[in-house]
A protein has these predicted regions:
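AAA+ P-loop NTPase nucleotide-binding core of proteostasis motors
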Residues: 11, 18, 23-26, 164-170, ...
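ATP/nucleotide-binding catalytic cores
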Residues: 1-263, 393, 401, 426-430, ...
Length: 611
C-alpha cells in the first residue's frame, strides 16, 4: 500500500513522547487489534502490526536496544533487539534468573521488572530496554489482591519512582490492559511516573483506509475502480464498531464462503451474528410487508394510524436504509417507541411484528423494566462482571441475542428502568452492540428494538398529584401532541437524558385510546375464544341468548380505562369463572348445546342462568 503521507496515529505519537518522560506506561482500550502504521523498512508504505511490534516501531528510533514481552502462560520472550540490545536483554534474564518461553510465578515476574528497571545500576552503559506486560490483568486472581499481589504492585510502584533515565528514555515497563480499572486505583491514579494512554477503536477514516487495502482480497471484486472504491466504502461503513483485526477476519470469511465483494454487507453480517442468511432481505418479507396493514389491523384493533406508522419504519428497515443517513449501518435494523394508554395493543403489536418479520411469534424477547429499577439489575441483562455470582451464566438480554440475533426485543415501560440501563440502551441505539459481563461483544444489528411507555397519559400536577394529561374525549392528533410533548419533557428535563430522546424522537408511535367500536370487537372475539375452548375440551357448543350476550358486552365495555386488558379481565370474571363452576358441576356430553339465558350478580361473583 502506498499512501500519500503515512503517519503514526495520535496514541502512538503520545507513546513516542512518553518514552522520554515516564518509566512506566499503561495502555488500555483497543489493545488487541491490528494497527495500520508506516512501515519502518519502506518509506512511504504502510503495513498492519500488532501492539508489541507497533511499540518497537517507535522505541527503536528512540535508541532502545531490545523489547521483551511477558504474557501469562507463555512466559517472557525477546521480541526484537539490536546486537548491543540483545546483550542487555540477556543480562536482564540472568539477573531475574528466568528463561524464555517458560511460565513464571508472581515472584519471578517481580524479579523481571526489577531487573529491567534497575539494569543501568548494574552496567556501565548501554541502550535502554523495554518490557511489555501483555494481559497484565491476568497477573491477578481476583478483585481482592493477595499479599503477594500487593507486594508485586508495591514493588513496581517503588521501582517507577527510583528509575534512572537512559539517554533519551528509560528502561520502560508497559502495562497492557483492556480496562484501566483492572489495576487498583491506588496504583494507577495520581502516579506521575505512570503514563496512561488509551488506544481508541478505529474511526471511519481508519476503517476506510483498511477496507481499501483489504478489499483486493475479496472474491469477484468489480473491475471498475469507482465500483471497487464503492465496495470499500460500504465495507468501512458496515464495519462500524469493529476492529481492524475483525475486518481482516471478515475478508477471510468472505473468501471461504464465496461471498463476492458486491455483497460485503452479507459478509460483515455473517461475521457478527454467525449466520449468512438475512431474513430482512427475503422477498417473502417484502411481500408480507406490502399486505401487512390489513393483517396487523385485524390483530391490533382500533389503531390504524399506529399500524401505518410502524409499517413505514419497517419498510426502511427491510430496505436496509436504517442508519444510512448517518453513514452508520451497524445500528439496529429498526427502533420503535410505542406510547399510549394501557391495554391498547402496544405489547400485542410487538408480538405481531415478531411473527410478521421472522415467521415466529416466539422470535420475541420481552423485558418488563419495572423489574430492572435497581442499580444491580444491569447484571441480569448483560451478565455479572468477573468475580461476582452468576458471572458464568451471562445476561438474559445478551444471551438471547447471541442465540437468536433476528428477533424483536421489547423493553416494556422504559421509564421505570434504572438510569444505568439507559446508558446501555443508548449504546445499543448508537453502536448496535453491547459488551456482556464476560467481555464478549453482542450485536443488535439484525434486531428490531421496541420500547413502550405510558408517559404522557397521567402527569404530575400540583403537589405532585397525578393529573390526566389526555382523555378518551380528545381526538388522536391532540393526544399525540400532548403525549409527545411530555415524553420530551421527561427525557430532556426530568431525568436529564436529552441524548436518549434524540435517538427515539423520530420513532415515537402514539396509540389512541380504545374506542367503543374496537372495544366491542375485542369483547366479541374474547367470548368467541371461550366458546372455542368449550368446543375443543368438551365437544359441546356454547350459545347465548340475545339479552345475555348484550349484558355481557355491556359489562365488558363499560369502563375502557384499562383498555383491552380490562375487557378480557371483565369477561374472565363475569363469564369464564361461573362457566368453569358450571362445567365442573355438570360436565356436558359431546354434542350438547349449552345455552346461557342470563348472567346475574351474586354477591362478589356472577352466576350463569342456563336454559
Amino acid at each position: 500500500v502506498n499512501p500519500e503521507h503515512p503517519t503514526n496515529p495520535a496514541w502512538l505519537r503520545e507513546i513516542d513522547l512518553a518514552l522520554c518522560a515516564h518509566p512506566q506506561i499503561l495502555l488500555t482500550g483497543n489493545v488487541r487489534d491490528l494497527y495500520r502504521l508506516p512501515d519502518p523498512g519502506f518509506a512511504g508504505r504502510v503495513r498492519f502490526m500488532g501492539l508489541v511490534e507497533a511499540l518497537w516501531s517507535v522505541a527503536q528510533p528512540r535508541g532502545y536496544g531490545a523489547l521483551l514481552a511477558y504474557s501469562t502462560g507463555v512466559g517472557v520472550e525477546l521480541i526484537s533487539a539490536t546486537p548491543e540490545g540483545r546483550t542487555a536483554a540477556e543480562q536482564v534474564l540472568r539477573e531475574a534468573d528466568v528463561e524464555q518461553r517458560r511460565p513464571l510465578h508472581m515472584a519471578q515476574v517481580r524479579d523481571l521488572i526489577t531487573a529491567v528497571t534497575d539494569l543501568d545500576r548494574r552496567r556501565a552503559a548501554g541502550p535502554p530496554v523495554a518490557l511489555v506486560l501483555s494481559d497484565a490483568a491476568r497477573l491477578f486472581t481476583g478483585e481482592l489482591l493477595s499479599p503477594e499481589e500487593r507486594l508485586f504492585l508495591a514493588t513496581a510502584d517503588r521501582l517507577a519512582y527510583r528509575a534512572l533515565p537512559v539517554g533519551n528514555g528509560y528502561n520502560t515497563v508497559f502495562w497492557v490492559l483492556d480496562r484501566e480499572h483492572d489495576l487498583p486505583a491506588w496504583f494507577a491514579t495520581g502516579n506521575h511516573t505512570l503514563r496512561i494512554t488509551g488506544i481508541p477503536e478505529p474511526d471511519l477514516s481508519a476503517r476506510l483506509a483498511t477496507a481499501r487495502d483489504m478489499a483486493v482480497k475479496l472474491p469477484e471484486m468489480p473491475e471498475e475502480e469507482s465500483e471497487r472504491q464503492a465496495v470499500a466504502r460500504r465495507f468501512a461503513e458496515a464495519s462500524h464498531g469493529m476492529r481492524l483485526r475483525s475486518m481482516q477476519d471478515v475478508v477471510r470469511l468472505a473468501a471461504a464462503a464465496g461471498i463476492p465483494g458486491a455483497r460485503i454487507d452479507d459478509a460483515v453480517r455473517a461475521f457478527r451474528v454467525g449466520v449468512p442468511d438475512n431474513p430482512w432481505q427475503s422477498a417473502g418479507l417484502r411481500d408480507r410487508l406490502r399486505t401487512a396493514e390489513k393483517e396487523l389491523g385485524t390483530r391490533v384493533l382500533g389503531q390504524p394510524d399506529a399500524v401505518r406508522r410502524v409499517l413505514d419504519i419497517l419498510a426502511r428497515s427491510a430496505t436496509g436504509l436504517s442508519g444510512a443517513h448517518t453513514g452508520n449501518t451497524s445500528k439496529p435494523r429498526g427502533v420503535l417507541f410505542f406510547a399510549g394508554p394501557t391495554g391498547v395493543g402496544k405489547t400485542e403489536l410487538a408480538k405481531a411484528l415478531a411473527e410478521l418479520l421472522f415467521g415466529d411469534e416466539n422470535a420475541y424477547l420481552r423485558f418488563d423494566m419495572s423489574e430492572f429499577s435497581a442499580e444491580h439489575s444491569e447484571a441480569r441483562l448483560i451478565g455479572a462482571p468477573p468475580g461476582f455470582i452468576g458471572h458464568d451464566a451471562g445476561g438474559e438480554l445478551t444471551n438471547g441475542i447471541r442465540q437468536q440475533p433476528f428477533r424483536v426485543v421489547l423493553f416494556d415501560e422504559i421509564e421505570k428502568a434504572h438510569q444505568r440501563l439507559l446508558d446501555k440502551f443508548l449504546q445499543i441505539l448508537d453502536d448496535g452492540r453491547l459488551t456482556d459481563g464476560r467481555g464478549g461483544t453482542v450485536y443488535f444489528t439484525e434486531a428490531l428494538i421496541v420500547f413502550t411507555t405510558n408517559l404522557g397519559i397521567v402527569v404530575p400536577g400540583e403537589d405532585n398529584k397525578p393529573v390526566e394529561n389526555v382523555t378518551d374525549e380528545m381526538e388522536l392528533p391532540e393526544i399525540e401532541e400532548r403525549v409527545r410533548q411530555y415524553i420530551e419533557v421527561f427525557f430532556r428535563h426530568l431525568i436529564g437524558r436529552p441524548e436518549l430522546y434524540n435517538r427515539v424522537e423520530q420513532s415515537i408511535v402514539v396509540f389512541d385510546f380504545l374506542r367503543p367500536e374496537a372495544a366491542l370487537e375485542i369483547a366479541d372475539r374474547t367470548i368467541g375464544r371461550v366458546a372455542d375452548a368449550v368446543r375443543r375440551n368438551f365437544g359441546a357448543t356454547l350459545e347465548f341468548s340475545d339479552s345475555a350476550r348484550e349484558e355481557l358486552l355491556q359489562q365488558a365495555t363499560y369502563n375502557l380505562r384499562n383498555g383491552g386488558r380490562g375487557i378480557v379481565a371483565t369477561i374472565e370474571s363475569i363469564l369464564l369463572n361461573p362457566l368453569a363452576r358450571e362445567l365442573f358441576a355438570r360436565p356436558p356430553v359431546p354434542g350438547q348445546a349449552l345455552r346461557v339465558a342470563a348472567i346475574e350478580p351474586q354477591g362478589q361473583n356472577y352466576v350463569l342462568v342456563m336454559e
